[in-house]
Amino acid sequence: MEVCGGHTHAIYRHGLPELLPPMIELVHGPGCPVCVLPMGRIDDGLALAEQPNVIFAAFGDMMRVPGRKGTPLEYQARGADVRMVYSPLDALKLAQANPQKHVVFFAIGFETTAPSTALTLMRAKQLGIRNFSVFCNHVLIVPAIRAILDSPDMRLDGFIGPGHVSTVIGCRPYLFVARDYGKPLVVSGFEPLDLLQAILMILRQLREGRAEVENQYRRVVPWNGNPAALKAMAEVFELRPYFEWRGLGFISQSAFKIAPAYADWDAEVRFDIPGIRVTDPKAAQCGEVLKGVLKPPQCKLFGRECTPEHPIGALMVSNEGACAAYYHYVHRLSATRSA
């Protein structure tokens, strides 16, 4: 299983499955933060966008993710002040430029993006900017991997470990995969040769009867991670007791919340969040794809009702979603060839 959504796109973009022998199957994991966010959290965030005098700021890949009553872009069309930003600091600058408004930043991502949110909150506190808050949806990769390993559907032989997340947390947090579950894990880069080498390293471990954590991406990923980023996250965030993941259910200590020292900048403290629970559309099978039980084209809606132009599930919306990757690099190419 390649855990990271960026790896999924690289695998399909470069046609790597066609280069591998049939006995090697690549299974797509839950490493897309937009895809694993349940619809209820999206609705909670969009409820903030409907508040008077609120500017709702979000990354571009969130703008087309549907809640029950529409996407952020559709809320914008109905009159809500929804802005796309490229970083949390952009949202903070919005707050400085609009002192009469309250800016809520919809924070999302794994440990890759959490440090930038943490540093932005530290900056807001330092400058005393009070018309800014964060709706925190940062999730953690290690509890998700553990949930997959504990799943009764688990039929995996090894893991391609995430590249970007590991630049922050390092390789050490994955040791439990080999120690407790006897599965090899190799942290990989994103070039075709990186991924092929990572697959080769996993196969060598399996052939030799080993289960270890190895680092193919040593040119970028330090074994112990990024100390400055880890320190910032430790200051600003603490673990939630549990958090709901699309397809995986509730996972304990799998997401960050904003620490009490930064409560003045916590949207969940500043506003009355409804705490909506929503089930996914019945026909969509995002959960099974996220767990690696199904391939994207095995979903009944894939390529028919659910396309990038009209996405039903989050896996088709996000740039890192497995369904979007398969559609762009495999399904569309196959349709062109058959025509």
What are these regions (language model features)?
Residues 59, 85, 106, 135-137, ...:
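Generic beta-sheet signal
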Residues 127-130, 209:
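Secondary-structure transition/capping motifs at alpha-helix termini
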Residues 135, 153-222:
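A conserved active-site cap/scaffold subdomain adjacent to cofactor or substrate pockets
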Residues 1-100, 114, 118, 122-127, ...:
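Metallocofactor- and cofactor-centric catalytic cores in central/energy metabolism, strongly enriched
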